[in-house]
Design a protein with these regions (language model features):
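Active-site-proximal loop and beta-strand segments within enzyme catalytic domains
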Residues: 149-150, 179-185, 190-191, 206-286
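Active-site Gly/Thr loop motif
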Residues: 324-326, 331, 381-438
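Active-site-proximal alpha-helical segments within enzyme catalytic domains
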Residues: 293-300, 345-367, 427-443
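Classical Sec-dependent N-terminal signal peptides that target proteins to the secretory pathway
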Residues: 1-19
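Active-site helix/loop module of the DD-peptidase/beta-lactamase fold
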Residues: 208-246, 305-344, 349, 366
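Catalytic-site signature segments of enzymes, centered on catalytic residues
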Residues: 173, 185-186, 250-335, 341-345
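N-terminal leader/targeting segments and the immediately adjacent pre-domain N-terminus
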Residues: 17-181, 212, 240
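Active-site SXXK
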Residues: 166, 187-214, 238, 297-301, ...
């Protein structure tokens, strides 16, 4: 009985803390609405009277004399669904697609781009990348596309870019009366799983510089891997999500939760080896998507060269080669600490810088550079996905194969080299290497 009471008390305390946290979030969101003049979604009222104002009649001469009218309060005028405090808009609830209203989209946009607790913008930074001293300047030959314009006016799309034959030919952003007042060319937006593909691209550079062997090398020289499920595993199996680890992730949420229930994204590789994968053996190697393997491989690169040299590698890729215009950064997991510091593959960047990264991959492929040969080797070593991922709505389901943290094998063009970087919520960058075309979308 005593244990039940303790559990009940802890539950009630947690519920109370969550309610306080949500009230604080709404208060900050309301201030942001005022700052950005979203006038339809707030109104000004008066807060609870304090001091002398408690005993004075509202709007009386004495009430004004004592400045009681200065105690203003911003009151939200919106219908926001917080999905029980979820840090992201869920894609499905009980098997049905979620259709968030405008106010909810606006609220989550605010959460995504501002230093609010629980989101990437406010997460500890593992590495900062400064703007390039030699920014790549795009060429433009813009054309009007009525369909794309219409979608920008009624959907959660923030940005749409079409790059072909060396030029940007479609460049659309959310209009001012939707999200255009707050989403600009300077807004850093989260990558979500696009970071997986970028981790692969970084790995390719590390291989080309001789820091890492090749995609058939094993990662046995990393001490934390000893006696774990990933000992004796080839890099190609890890980056193809075919490490035989599917039995040790949650059946209900294999991307984000271990079988133990702990978070995948917020665990360092060392802690994962100690608590999730020690003394385990791999099962049959098949495609099994999760968020851990990209973190594992990116931190392996850091282990191989050290943090200082890793910063140099990142600067070479993003500042010297890609030529990013704005700064960007990668974040750390919550459990990262001195002595066990690690990076996530999640990063934040601006819309044109995302396109610059995609263009660099396209250039490497077409110029047959060492990194281009690496990308081609991924395509040659691609593996089939499983039927459980199939659907007709997104790149997960529309692609039949997986190539080193890239989706590929689109229906109707399975044998063509088209790579897709896909991030939760609508960060999708599709590179058609044969036709020199990139489609880049960013959404809430």
């Amino acid at each position: 009985m005593r244990n039940i009471l303790i559990i009940l008390c802890l539950f009630l305390l947690n519920v109370s803390a969550q309610a306080d946290r949500q009230e604080r979030r709404f208060s900050n969101f309301n201030k942001w609405l005022v700052q950005n003049e979203f006038k339809d979604y707030y109104k000004l009222g008066f807060g609870e009277p304090i001091g002398k104002c408690k005993d004075l009649e509202k709007f009386s001469m004495h009430w004004y004399y004592n400045n009681c009218d200065k105690n203003k309060k911003i009151i939200g005028n919106y219908d926001v669904n917080t999905y029980n405090g979820n840090s992201e808009i869920p894609e499905k609830i009980q098997g049905k697609d979620v259709k968030a209203n405008y106010e909810t989209l606006l609220y989550y946009f605010w959460r995504y781009v501002h230093n609010d607790e629980g989101n990437w913008a406010g997460a500890p930074r593992y590495i900062d990348i400064k703007p390039s001293d030699n920014t790549y300047q795009f060429k433009f030959d813009l054309r009007n596309d009525k369909y794309i314009k219409k979608q920008m006016q009624k959907t959660a799309l923030l940005s749409y870019l079409l790059y072909e034959d060396g030029k940007i030919v479609i460049d659309e952003m959310s209009p001012k009366d939707r999200f255009g007042k707050v989403y600009t060319n300077e807004t850093q937006f989260h990558s979500q799983s696009v970071g997986k593909s970028l981790a692969s691209y970084i790995l390719g550079h590390a291989i080309c510089k001789g820091y890492v062997g090749n995609i058939d090398s094993k990662i046995n020289d990393w001490p934390i891997i000893k006696n774990s499920i990933y000992h004796d595993q080839k890099i190609i199996d890890i980056i193809n999500m075919a490490a035989g680890d599917q039995a040790y992730f949650s059946k209900n949420n294999p991307s984000n939760r271990y079988k133990t229930g702990r978070s995948v994204s917020n665990t360092t590789p060392k802690k994962a080896m100690e608590n999730e994968f020690k003394e385990l053996k791999p099962s049959k190697k098949r495609y099994a998507y999760n968020n851990f393997l990209p973190h594992l491989i990116l931190n392996y690169v850091i282990f191989k060269i050290g943090e200082e040299k890793y910063q140099e590698l990142i600067d070479d890729i993003f500042r010297k080669k890609i030529g990013i215009e704005h700064g960007m950064f990668f974040v750390e997991p919550e459990t990262s600490e001195p002595g066990d510091r690690s990076t996530r593959t999640t990063f934040l960047a601006t819309r044109y810088d995302y396109l610059r990264m995609s263009k660099a991959m396209l250039d490497d492929w077409q110029n047959d550079t060492c990194e281009g040969k690496y990308l081609k080797s991924l395509f040659e070593r691609r593996i089939k996905k499983n039927e459980q991922w199939e659907n007709n709505k997104d790149s997960f389901g529309l692609t039949k194969s997986y190539a080193g943290f890239f989706h590929t094998g689109l229906k109707g063009m399975k044998k063509r080299p088209v790579f897709i970087m896909d991030g939760y919520g609508g960060q999708i960058f599709t590179i058609d290497f044969e036709r020199a075309r990139i489609v880049a979308t960013i959404a809430i």
